[in-house]
Swiss-Prot record:
Homodimer. It comes from Sinorhizobium medicae (strain WSM419) (Ensifer medicae). The lineage of its organism: Bacteria, Pseudomonadati, Pseudomonadota, Alphaproteobacteria, Hyphomicrobiales. The active site is at C113, H250, N280. The keyword Cytoplasm applies. It is found in: Cytoplasm. This is Beta-ketoacyl-[acyl-carrier-protein] synthase III.
Amino acid sequence: MIRSVVRGFGAALPKRVMTNKEMESKVDTSDEWIVQRTGIRQRYIAGDGETTASLGEAAARAALERAGLTPDDIDLIIVATSTPDNTFPATAVNIQNRLGMRHGAAFDMQAVCSGFVYAVTTGDAYIRGGLATRVLVIGAETFSRILDWTDRTTCVLFGDGAGAIVLEAQEGAGTKADRGVLTAQLRSDGAHGDKLYVDGGPSTTGTVGHLRMEGREVFKHAVGMITDVIEAAFEATGTTADDIDWLVPHQANRRIIEGSAKKLGIPLEKVVVTVDLHGNTSAASIPLALDAAATDGRIKRGDLVMLEAMGGGFTWGSVLLRW
């Protein structure tokens, strides 16, 4: 049985760090208020010359280097982003060009904060279907450029960055002991589209628009949706929360992260948390967290890792993989 195994990983962050203290000078807020409600202490903000594509390229190159591969070895690039450099062409095609690739395919996926989970699921499907041997999956965002910097309820939450993994086809035994993606569960419900959205677009306002969010409504749904889709992954693979070595959640808010882990019975010692350093980087948050935990040695070969995310739409999903 063919499995999609993580062969390499990488990350990239903008040069500029914006602390909560600096945020105090922009809007009516405080470090104490932000930390207490979100767990965020700082975030990275893209500067001149730093774009979604440039950050994505840097993360991709880091992942390729760690995998011992070159762009020539990649068959497909999937970029999860809600903040593309252009309406078209796709950011993935831009990154393909930056990497010097003249073969294969490249496209973007947009599922907001769930984007990386959706992209990994799609890359896994290409590999299992025999359409690709190696897939470069990137989550890259510059959310700072769609924020309303006068809205203290949203501008304090988000940051910029990119992360990437290389998925490679490897033969497995077809058991839960295999390395690679074991199952993926995706969900969406468009009835909640007005809870987290951008108030602009090419066919409506002709503007980029700004992010708008009903935070309490998002929080109200988040824990239940996340735990349901993780439990679906357990059922599909015959695993339980006790089998999980690491939960790598979308880094939206520490309260959501802790609430989901508690409901699932996963101790916080097994949860990778980077929201304090990065803020909410949407589709980039999971690969950034993976990179941090794999680089410092927490996530090791053979570990059972659960990825989960929820984003605007609503969209949500989980991927269970063995590292």
